[in-house]
């Protein structure tokens, strides 16, 4: 019951043992040509006279000495032994125990099973014996015939564990991997140290795996965390019905499908107990019984898992200071100033895209995208999700996405936004301080320093909120005496810790008790923490500049697209011309001096102009323009199929629909360039490239300080993802939604010479920005 030469001697001692080929091989000799070994994996040819002599003798009826003896006189003992050693070294031979003395004793119980384990790289005879000495216990959490499962186990050589004994492996059968009963199953197996294989039946796509190993690899809670992320739509119903788990789904399967799933589960159990370790044991393996396709979905361990990991990882990261370090730029072109290229980013983080175990189900090209636009979608926008049934219905249109000049760039951008939104969602392990603003003193920042709602908006909040838009929702006045949760953020300008309401820092499913809510303003994923910090800051500057222009309706200088001399610009313009659109751009640069550009486009062939726009900010004006143009392309699929009769919009939100149907360049003159101001080209912005992201961090820190503001950062990176995510906050900078408190919105346009005096509150643009 061993490899023939496993003891290093030749011929091996055997006490009557018989030498022959392994069970998965069938030998055939073609005289004068070769001896052939046929298996499920192909044919092996053995050439030479030695093979023609020895192969017929290796039929398992002779001892090693008998093979040497019968090979003579054609081969000397030394020649035969040398050839046998070569065959043994190739893993082709097996030494079997002597045949049973009783003529009624059964032969090998299952020659095909023995051959299967041989093909797996094991000793088939030894493996069958090992399986007979180990045990498995089926555990049913669903309506399944355990006798049928037990019969399948026995048919594959597995031994069922007797009652009240420990099994070597549990086979847990359920109908949903998020069944609340699995918490108890997981806890019991961790306490006993017993591995268990999870299987879901009762569906057209059965799930098999992984094998959970207490103390090693991911646990059920790691997997459940990822699975819940794909089932947000069930949570409002679960909450409304008071369920402790997801709503039960009706079974949808045939008897044949159930039998296949059971047999595959038993196969995985047998492989595990036999000692085979493959990637399938660490994956959720799905079988599409309609299309007969199997897919492996690797399960990742969450380092911060509260059950099998270190639940304090996130808290320690957030509590500590944000200390930027040197990050040389690997990319310094129109792709951006990054530490990694888009292809490197995708190679490193692309595994996060998986419909079962990833954080985003898929990344796909945006429906309706014209060929000249690279726009991709990456699933639900977690910043817009809701914990109510009504919110769910309203939020089904909200998707995260990505942009770029190429599909690779846009796909990577979409992944980055998905990670950004996921990382910015509250998961329960974030550090908080529960107290009131008054009790916390100077470290705490009043939320309206960031939200910037005017007192009149707060008083008139019912009218503002009547439209139901989450982006334009006005909260109740903040109660400074009421305790709430606060999150530590790091001040790069003050080099100290500050506090902001947690409900403003992380997305949540339910309305927070303090009435506040988070938005994505200043959230960014990057190739490094420094990269994410810089990108988040640039977004704040961009949106502040957009707000100054939009709500004051100032006329801004145009941007001379030809002056940039970029071939991609002409390609885009030609593409827009093919869909009967005009393209232009405006300079929105504010007192921060960082180039901010708005790109706009309108239909030229019908009264409703379906005006779309995009914005971009960067130290390099070429990159600012590129970002504005590619962001504008993300809106184009929503209006690309509009008919002259006014149908074909891909959204139902009233605000963008009203804009597209009624706003034109003529009745919204602030959308057009100021004819009295010269158009801007790339040389009109002072720009000196830097080679290290740390230099950019220093620049934005000092720039913020010079404006009398504070640069705050919250590291939202998740240990299980690895992609850095930072939320950047600069109290006083405007988001581009309608936030009308006193400050920059009124004063800065006057300081820049755009307005002779501050625009009165009641004369601000009544059309809210809807992106």
Regions found by a protein language model. Name each.
Residues 156-159, 166-261, 271-276, 288-320:
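E1/E1-like adenylate-forming module used to activate ubiquitin-like modifiers
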Residues 3, 33, 39-160, 198, ...:
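Long, charge-rich, low-complexity alpha-helical segments
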Residues 259-267, 530:
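A structural signal for well-ordered alpha-helical segments within the folded catalytic domains
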Residues 264-272, 416:
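Short glycine/serine- and small hydrophobic-enriched flexible loop segments
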Residues 84, 150, 182-190, 573, ...:
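Short amphipathic alpha-helical segments and helix-helix/interface helices
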Residues 284, 291-771:
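Helix-biased "structured C-terminal domain" signature
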Residues 1-42:
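Long, low-complexity, charged/polar intrinsically disordered regions in eukaryotic proteins
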């Amino acid at each position: 019951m061993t490899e023939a030469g496993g003891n290093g001697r030749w011929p091996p001692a055997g006490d009557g043992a018989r030498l022959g080929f392994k069970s998965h091989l069938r030998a055939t000799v073609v005289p004068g040509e070769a001896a052939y070994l046929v298996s499920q994996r192909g044919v092996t040819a053995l050439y030479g006279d030695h093979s023609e002599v020895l192969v017929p003798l290796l039929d398992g009826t002779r001892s090693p000495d008998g093979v040497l003896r019968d090979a003579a006189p054609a081969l000397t003992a030394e020649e035969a032994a040398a050839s046998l050693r070569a065959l043994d070294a190739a893993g082709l031979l097996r030494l079997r125990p002597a045949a049973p003395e009783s003529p009624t004793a059964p032969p090998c119980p299952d020659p095909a099973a023995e051959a299967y384990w041989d093909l797996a790289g094991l000793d088939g005879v030894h493996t069958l014996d090992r399986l007979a000495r180990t045990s498995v216990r089926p555990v049913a959490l669903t309506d399944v015939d355990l006798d049928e499962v037990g019969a399948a186990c026995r048919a594959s050589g597995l031994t069922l564990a007797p009652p009240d004994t420990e099994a070597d492996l549990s086979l847990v059968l359920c109908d949903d991997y998020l069944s609340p009963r699995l918490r108890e199953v997981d806890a019991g197996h961790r306490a006993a140290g017993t591995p268990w294989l999870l299987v879901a039946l009762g569906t057209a796509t059965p799930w098999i795996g992984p094998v959970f190993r207490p103390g090693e690899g991911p646990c059920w809670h790691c997997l459940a965390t990822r699975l819940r992320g794909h089932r947000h739509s069930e949570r409002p119903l679960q909450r409304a019905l008071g369920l402790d788990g997801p709503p039960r789904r009706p079974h949808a399967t045939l008897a044949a499908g159930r039998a296949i799933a059971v047999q595959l589960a038993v196969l995985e159990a047998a492989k595990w107990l036999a000692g085979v370790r493959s990637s399938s044991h660490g994956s959720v393996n799905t079988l599409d019984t309609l299309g007969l396709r199997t897919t492996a979905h690797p399960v990742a361990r969450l380092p911060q898992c509260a059950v099998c990991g270190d639940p304090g990882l996130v808290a320690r990261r957030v509590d500590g200071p944000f200390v930027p370090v040197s990050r040389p730029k690997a990319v310094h072109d129109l792709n951006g100033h990054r530490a990694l290229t888009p292809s490197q980013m995708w190679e490193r983080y692309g595994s996060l895209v998986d419909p079962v175990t990833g954080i985003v189900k898929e990344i796909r090209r945006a429906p309706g995208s014209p060929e000249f636009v690279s726009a991709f979608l990456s699933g639900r926008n977690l910043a817009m999700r809701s914990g109510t049934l009504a919110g769910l219905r309203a939020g089904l249109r909200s998707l995260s996405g990505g942009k770029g000049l190429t599909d690779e760039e846009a796909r990577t951008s979409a992944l980055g936004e998905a990670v950004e939104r996921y990382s910015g969602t509250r998961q329960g392990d974030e550090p908080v301080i529960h107290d009131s603003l008054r009790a916390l003193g100077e470290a705490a920042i009043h939320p309206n320093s960031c939200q910037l709602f005017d007192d009149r908006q707060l008083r008139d909040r019912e009218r503002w909120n009547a439209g139901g838009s989450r982006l334009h929702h006005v909260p109740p006045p903040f109660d400074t005496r009421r305790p709430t949760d606060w999150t530590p953020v790091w001040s790069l300008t003050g080099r100290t810790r500050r506090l902001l309401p947690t409900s403003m820092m992380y997305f949540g499913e339910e309305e927070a008790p303090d009435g506040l809510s988070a938005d994505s303003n200043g959230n960014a994923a990057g190739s490094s923490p420094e990269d994410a910090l810089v990108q988040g800051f640039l977004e704040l500057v961009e949106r502040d500049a957009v707000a100054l222009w939009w709500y004051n309706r100032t006329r801004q200088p145009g941007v001379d697209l030809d002056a940039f001399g970029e071939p991609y610009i002409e390609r885009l313009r030609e593409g827009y011309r093919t869909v009967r659109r005009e393209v232009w751009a405006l300079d929105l640069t504010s007192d921060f001096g960082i180039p901010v550009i708005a790109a706009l486009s309108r239909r030229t062939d019908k009264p409703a102009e379906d005006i779309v726009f995009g914005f971009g900010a960067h130290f390099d004006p070429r990159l600012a323009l590129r970002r504005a143009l590619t962001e504008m392309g993300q809106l184009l699929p929503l209006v690309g199929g509009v008919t002259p009769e006014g149908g074909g919009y891909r959204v139902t939100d009233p605000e963008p629909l009203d804009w597209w149907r009624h706003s034109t360049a003529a009745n919204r003159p602030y959308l057009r360039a100021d004819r009295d101001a010269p158009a801007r080209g790339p040389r009109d912005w002072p720009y000196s490239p830097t080679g290290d992201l740390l230099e950019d961090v220093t620049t934005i820190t000092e720039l913020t300080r010079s404006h009398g503001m504070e640069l705050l950062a919250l590291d939202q990176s998740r240990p299980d993802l690895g992609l850095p995510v930072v939320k950047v906050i600069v109290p006083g900078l405007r988001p581009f939604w309608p936030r009308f408190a006193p400050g920059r919105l009124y004063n800065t346009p006057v300081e820049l010479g755009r307005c002779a005096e501050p625009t009165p509150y009641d004369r601000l643009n009544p059309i809210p920005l809807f992106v």
